[in-house]
Amino acid sequence: MSVKIHYQNTHFITSAPDIRHLPADEGIEIAFAGRSNAGKSSALNRLTNQKNLAKTSKTPGRTQLINLFKVTEGCHIVDLPGYGFAQVPLEMKNKWQKSLGEYLQKRECLKGLVVLMDIRHPMKDLDQQMIFWAIESRIPVQVLLTKADKLKSGARKAELLKVRKLAETFGGDVQVDVYSSLKGLGVDQLRAKLDTWFAPALAHLQEDEEGSNSAE
């Protein structure tokens, strides 16, 4: 019997300034990354059907910590600090970028990266840097073109094709899809993608349950 993931049960565990302050490097983590105005918090809230799981802020760049959420046993979502906000001091920007790079390159339990980009301003330099880091670490990437409702259907498809073509040049496992927190566009596909990334942890969970049942 397969284990179904109920994303609405996702809850906050802890915040950390860098990789050294995170809990033990075990289980499976899926990280969400994006520019400060990419709609990351709204996307996480829509994914989990919770209004305030990830705090949305009127001031981009407020999220300076790595935030860890538990989805189910052995499965976690990591909300990485938003990047690329112009009004943040350079020293802080550099610190964030170092933390992001360190996390993507050294965290063993990281098994997937979701990079969110405003569909009207995709593939900025830092977005591409995040993807490069993930590919170097052999981590699959799901690019979400957010705020897709802001474009009409034709323009949306054209932008999607353009970004998919660019994504092919990275090599590695990079998928690109559209997403709208407002309209719910792409939410089911995102859940399905996370299901596949979390599957090994769930398989272990099932084995443990079956083992304990047979022991009884």
Swiss-Prot record:
GO MF, one example: GTP binding
Domain EngB-type G: 26-200
Residues the entry annotates as binding Mg(2+): 41, 63
Record keyword Cell cycle present: yes
Gene Ontology CC terms: cytosol
Pfam families: MMR_HSR1 (PF01926)
Family matches, as InterPro entries: G_ENGB_dom, GTP-bd, GTP-bd_ribosome_bio_YsxC, P-loop_NTPase
Cofactor(s) this protein cannot do without: Mg(2+)
Ranges in coiled-coil conformation: none
Domain of life: Bacteria
Keyword annotations of the record: Cell cycle, Cell division, GTP-binding, Magnesium, Metal-binding, Nucleotide-binding, Septation
Keyword Cell cycle: yes
GO annotation, biological process: division septum assembly
Residues that hold GTP according to the record: 34-41, 61-65, 79-82, 146-149, 179-181
Family: Belongs to the TRAFAC class TrmE-Era-EngA-EngB-Septin-like GTPase superfamily. EngB GTPase family.
Role of this protein: Necessary for normal cell division and for the maintenance of normal septation.
Protein name: Probable GTP-binding protein EngB
